Amino acid sequence: MAGACATFFYNLNAASTLIKSDEIDYAVIGSAEAPINPEVTDGFFATTGIADDKKIIAMQERHGESIEDIDFSKACRPFGDNCGLVLGESSQFAVVTSLEFAIKIGAEILCAVPHVFINSDGIKKSISSPGIGNYITMAQAFSNYIKDFDNKKQTCVIAHGTGTFQNRSTESDVLSKCATSLDIKNLKVTGLKGYLGHTMGPAGGDQLACSLGIFNQGIIPGLNSTPILADDVVKENLNFCMTNEEINIDDLDAFFLNAKGFGGNNATTSIYNPNFVKKLLPEIFTKKEINSYEKSLENTKKKKFDYNEKCLSGEFNLLYRANEELLNPDEDLEINQDSIKLKDYPDIEI
């Protein structure tokens, strides 16, 4: 599914919708894009939204920095006095399951994805101009968070943060207006494109991977390439993480991952702390089921550790299954008025 910079979240939403409707137990979702080539780069230059050597040097000069060489490590400066986006490349994939299926197979729960909100703009003044839809998705995410948590602690937005003039003013206004309207105080804000560039379709996957890493390690990566916020950045009720911040993981309730895509493809995804899910388990499952899950989880973590150790030593034993257990339509398939029967699979209702 293609939705410009919101593509990953569109795919995540498709999986979430199917899981919540009990049509599937799990899905592998993601996006991959490699846009750094002459044709794509020339196209972005035509939009005037991309940083080039001349713009970067001028930006460095405005900041009183050396202009003898380009500092590519700070070419993209989200929410700062910047000069345009920098193209990046990425491939991000995730396994999404229902809670019941995760417990059944002994999966390690890394987070909860309760909501993905999408609102595409129909009427726009230009193809790349932000519209009203992102206010809607962000307000929906904030509102549902308020309903879901009784004792609220900290929250953090991993912003779209492209490093363009338009983004810094419009996205900060979205965040501030929604936070202020819904009485969310001291909302932390960071972004990743100062590290990775703008990876286009997989950008939401970068944000998801980052949020999982923060829940695991307790460090929020700051806007380290941005020395100071631009004058037109809206700051009310927002706490921009200008440097890396170490946090207590238990004090962080949720992340809000935001995408403001070309063509008005807006999406905001709520990511809840895995501890939030673990506290709910006794309300949903029996003690016997939880004990069984915890034993299976130990085995999962051991396999994960062993696999990681092999990878670190250069052993990559990839799984590639070809011509294994293929179903024969003459022998393994039966179709009737009510269902489709497949050998060794549950019936499919029709």
Label for each model-derived stretch:
Residues 16-21, 41-54, 133, 170-182, ...:
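A glycine- and small-aliphatic-rich helix-loop capping segment at beta-alpha/alpha-beta transitions
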Residues 1-33, 86-105, 198-223, 234-244, ...:
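Active-site-proximal alpha-helical scaffold in enzymes
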Residues 23-83, 116-130, 159-168, 185-238:
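Acyl-CoA/ACP chain-elongation machinery
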Residues 55-150, 155-156, 272-334:
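Condensing-enzyme catalytic core mediating Claisen C-C bond formation in acyl metabolism
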Residues 8, 15, 44, 95, ...:
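Conserved small-residue
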Residues 25-29, 92, 110, 156, ...:
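Short glycine-aspartate micro-motif
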Residues 214-263, 267-268, 277, 282, ...:
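Internal helix-turn-beta structural module
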Residues 11, 137-149, 174, 178, ...:
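Stable alpha-helical structural segments in soluble proteins, enriched in small hydrophobic residues
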